[in-house]
Amino acid sequence: MDWLQFFFLHPVSLYQGAAFPFALLFNYLCITESFPTRARYLFLLAGGGVLALAAMGPYALLIFIPALCAVAMISSLSPQEVHGLTFFFQMGWQTLCHLGLHYKEYYLCEPPPVRFYITLSSLMLLTQRVTSLSLDISEGKVEAAWRGTRSRSSLCEHLWDALPYISYLLFFPALLGGSLCSFQRFQACVQRPRSLYPSISFWALTWRGLQILGLECLKVALRRVVSAGAGLDDCQRLECIYIMWSTAGLFKLTYYSHWILDDSLLHAAGFGSEAGQRPGEERYVPDVDIWTLETTHRISLFARQWNRSTAQWLKRLVFQRSRRWPVLQTFAFSAWWHGLHPGQVFGFLCWSVMVKADYLIHTFANGCIRSWPLRLLYRSLTWAHTQIIIAYVMLAVEGRSFSSLCRLCCSYNSIFPVTYCLLLFLLARRKHKCN
């Protein structure tokens, strides 16, 4: 009963599981002939509203208000100015909510309600959809809802025109978790003809359920190992590495199981399947590729594959638009988006330095190491170093507080990121001399 109690009674998992029958019902209704497009939008929107109220209670207003404001700005602003204003409004709103969490945790020293944590997580996902949509409009990929030429349209027509946008921002399969779905893909899936709508693959859902079950069993076993060992305060040398690695493994298993559950909900509703996809339609990007994450010896590849849709969103929103220090700016924005806790700021900035060092180290090694035995040894050592550094970053980010960060930095584990920092300095200096 240990893993059942830990996973299925987790609030987000519980609400995601409760939404599953409605996702299957939506998929079934889309296959029938009597479910028009507007009814599909309304079903997804109503489901999102009910799920938000059930999961967040009164805090659901923190989701509804920015979603309605975003639709109002999208409907009234020109494509040239829509992204800048919606971005600053959405990030400003999210930052205020995170400051409320800081005030509760650090000033009042009170644990915030679980519903507030769920709301903040959903708000971060809403920020992804709002900024993705505003970017699509500013880049001309999506037709703007700007009504400058139709100012005499009735209120009812304005509301029907805004329905796809508000439905996209609040549709229930992605409200509490899941891979970022672009507005183009969302609209294509909702408007897909009955003949092209993918049927429910119970084998695919069963396989995902078995994956979740296996991950939860591993998590139970690993949690017992972690609870039986010493903490970072009492560990010594190699024991610190083992404690850090096992604790980070517990975090990773939790993320993997939740991402697979979120992916299953999107598939059940018909938003995650490639079946029935039209030519030119955007492909679905799942958040997790466990094999790549656990076998890669490149920190930079891990960064691109960890929570893949979010990594692609950050690349588009920040990295590709930055003229100087794009890696640093991307990770700094990620720390802002996550809430600017001390551990998060340190963790993401440390990660950015590790990615930069990773590029230089592997570029240098690829030019020097020729024989396959040395390459095998090099790959093994860099794989171990990558896993340890990722574990270090993960403990910093998940620990969040300044006291947890101090314990981590004062432990024996800090020797590994310091080693990469020294290699970065030496290789950057060598590269500068060669140039």
From Swiss-Prot:
* Catalytic residue list: 307, 338
Cite a GO CC annotation.
endoplasmic reticulum membrane
Query: What residue ranges lie in the Lumenal compartment?
Result: 1-5, 57-59, 102-120, 228-240, 339-340, 398-407
Give the record's keywords alphabetically.
Acyltransferase, Endoplasmic reticulum, Membrane, Transferase, Transmembrane, Transmembrane helix
Transmembrane domains' residue ranges: 6-26, 41-56, 60-76, 83-101, 121-136, 207-227, 241-261, 325-338, 341-357, 377-397, 408-428
Q: Which reaction does it catalyse?
A: octanoyl-CoA + L-seryl-[protein] = O-octanoyl-L-seryl-[protein] + CoA; decanoyl-CoA + L-seryl-[protein] = O-decanoyl-L-seryl-[protein] + CoA; L-seryl-[protein] + acetyl-CoA = O-acetyl-L-seryl-[protein] + CoA; L-seryl-[protein] + butanoyl-CoA = O-butanoyl-L-seryl-[protein] + CoA
Say if the entry is tagged with keyword Electron transport. no
**Post-translational modification note:** Not glycosylated.
Select a single GO molecular function from the record's annotations and give it.
acyltransferase activity, transferring groups other than amino-acyl groups
Q: Which Pfam families does the entry link to?
A: MBOAT
InterPro entries per the UniProt record, alphabetical: LPLAT_7/PORCN-like (IPR049941), MBOAT_fam (IPR004299)
**Enzyme class, broadest EC rank:** transferase
According to its UniProt entry, the protein's GO biological process terms are: lipid modification; peptidyl-serine octanoylation
Topological domain ranges for the Cytoplasmic compartment:
27-40, 77-82, 137-206, 262-324, 358-376, 429-435
Q: How does it sit in the membrane?
A: Multi-pass membrane protein
Q: What is its EC number?
A: 2.3.1.-
Cross-referenced PANTHER family, in alphabetical order?
GHRELIN O-ACYLTRANSFERASE, PORCUPINE
Similarity comment text for this entry: Belongs to the membrane-bound acyltransferase family.
Q: How does it assemble?
A: Monomer.
Q: What does this protein do?
A: Catalyzes ghrelin acylation at 'Ser-3' using preferentially octanoyl-CoA, hexanoyl-CoA and decanoyl-CoA as acyl-CoA donors leading to ghrelin activity. In vitro uses also acyl-CoA donors of different lengths from short-chain (C2) to long-chain fatty acids (C16) knowing that acyl-CoA donors from butanoyl-CoA (C4) to dodecanoyl-CoA (C12) are more efficient compared to longer acyl-CoA donors, such as myristoyl-CoA (C14) and palmitoyl-CoA (C16) that are not efficient.
The protein's name in its UniProt record:
Membrane-bound ghrelin O-acyltransferase MBOAT4
Q: Which organism is it from?
A: Rattus norvegicus
Which gene is transcribed and translated to give this protein?
Answer: Mboat4
